[in-house]
UniProtKB/Swiss-Prot annotation:
A GO CC term attached to the entry: ribosome
Chain's role: One of the primary rRNA binding proteins, it binds directly to 16S rRNA central domain where it helps coordinate assembly of the platform of the 30S subunit.
GO BP, one annotated term: translation
The species this protein was found in: Paracidovorax citrulli (strain AAC00-1)
Highest taxon listed in the record's lineage: Bacteria
Family the UniProt entry places it in: Belongs to the universal ribosomal protein uS8 family.
Protein name as annotated: Small ribosomal subunit protein uS8
Tagged with keyword Transmembrane: no
Keywords: Ribonucleoprotein, Ribosomal protein, RNA-binding, rRNA-binding
Matching NCBIfam families: PRK00136.1
Record GO terms (molecular function): rRNA binding; structural constituent of ribosome
UniProt-listed SUPFAM superfamilies: Ribosomal protein S8
Lineage of origin: Bacteria, Pseudomonadati, Pseudomonadota, Betaproteobacteria, Burkholderiales
Length: 131
């Protein structure tokens, strides 16, 4: 069965796993999902991730992070979707919660946070907001 929006599926699996306090969540792997997981790890929203290959299929296993029994990720939501892509120039990349959260942006220079995209001077597709 094909999936219409694999990034939304990744975000939903993370959100659902954190609501039931799971330690890890496993999703089908892709280059963009690995890049998103790397940004989440660099920003401190997850403990880590590992790519596990079984034959011709690879799974991305994400270790979720909790603080005082509560999930570190309070809000994670998809912005750009297949039916309505959201592109922003370098000057109009949005801030999430006045800079307390991050927007994950895919640019010609790779997947990065909104702050890094502004510092690099590139715009791109706003994938999701994380706070």
């Amino acid at each position: 069965m094909s999936m219409s929006d694999p990034i939304a599926d990744l975000l939903t699996r993370i959100r659902n796993a954190q609501m039931v306090s799971k330690a890890t969540v496993s999703v089908p792997s892709s280059k963009v999902k690995i890049a998103i997981a790397q940004v989440l790890k660099d920003e401190g929203y997850i403990d880590g991730f590992e790519v596990k290959s079984e034959g011709n299929k690879s799974e991305l296993e994400i270790s979720l992070k909790y603080y005082a029994g509560r999930p570190v990720i309070e809000r994670i939501e998809r912005v750009s979707r297949p039916g309505l892509r959201v592109y922003k120039g370098r000057d109009s990349i949005p801030q999430v919660m006045n800079g307390l959260g991050v927007a994950i942006v895919t640019t010609p220079k790779g997947v990065m946070t909104d702050r890094k995209a502004r510092a690099t001077g590139v715009g791109g597709e706003v994938l999701c907001y994380v706070a």
